[in-house]
Amino acid sequence: MAISKKSSLFLPIFTFITMFLMVVNKVSSSTHETNALHFMFNQFSKDQKDLILQGDATTGTDGNLELTRVSSNGSPQGSSVGRALFYAPVHIWESSAVVASFEATFTFLIKSPDSHPADGIAFFISNIDSSIPSGSTGRLLGLFPDANVIRNSTTIDFNAAYNADTIVAVELDTYPNTDIGDPSYPHIGIDIKSVRSKKTAKWNMQNGKVGTAHIIYNSVDKRLSAVVSYPNADSATVSYDVDLDNVLPEWVRVGLSASTGLYKETNTILSWSFTSKLKSNEIPDIATVV
């Protein structure tokens, strides 16, 4: 059968369009398989619109994030609490029981004129409308409400006191508050809905030196792990198995929190990055900040 000149021109065009649509369809399918969020702050500007600052937290001082209050000459102040949360929610799990894996890293500088720095920094995950609990300065790290527990009580119900329904945190605790279950030394710990850590490890905090905290959640093993280190020094490592869909709501925000009390320290964040990945049939919500 003879093919007209017009038909011979149409066939290559039709073939090209068909192949193009196949490629587009393939790309779209693979994109929908992953719901991801990524951000990275190598420095912090004075008007950092993609952070939700709470309490005494400020940005822009030498390109850093100051979580707790400092004076005009940079000296730390007592009884301060501050938090910074990333503006975009994180899809941490979905109804099909798929849970996201995530990784967070931040560099920090804790400096204190006191012989006992206090009280520490925490990376935390909470509900999207999370705010600083009342009375959460000092040992409560800006994460847990003050339950007014009688200090001379010989028994403390930790299931009812100093807890929060939707908090998962990794704490860098510079001051041991043994009356609420802390070990008798500075430590890192994993907190699940309570200031009393599920697991702790001794931490040799170095006053005035830059350290790095690296946090990983493996959704396959359901293991939350953290490593805190300084250059040319031994690292502190802690891990705990937790199923996040039993602890957290489906959508959460991630943040950094810090507090001071009677004793004080600077709680300075120099950089912060976060990546999460959830296998899903939904279109991904990806935010990137450099």
Curated annotation (Swiss-Prot):
SUPFAM superfamilies for the chain: Concanavalin A-like lectins/glucanases (SSF49899)
Binding site for Mn(2+): E171, D173, D182, H187
Site (Cleavage): N148, V149, N163, A164, N281, E282
Post-translational modification: The mature chain consists of residues 164-281 followed by 30-148. To form a mature chain the precursor undergoes further post-translational modification after removal of the signal sequence; cleavage after Asn at positions 148, 163, and 281 is followed by transposition and ligation (By formation of a new peptide bond) of residues 164-281 and 30-148. This maturation (circular permutation) relies on the legumain AEP1 activity and leads to an increased stability of conA after heat stress and at various pH.
Signal peptide feature range: 1-29
Positions of the propeptide removed during maturation: 149-163, 282-290
Gene3D superfamilies associated with the record: 2.60.120.200
Annotated glycan sites: N152
Binding site for a carbohydrate: D119, R139, L262, Y263
Binding residues annotated for Ca(2+), in chain numbering: D119, D173, Y175, N177, D182
Role this protein plays: D-mannose specific lectin. Displays antiviral activity and therefore may contribute to defense against infections.
Protein name: Concanavalin-A
Record organism: Canavalia ensiformis
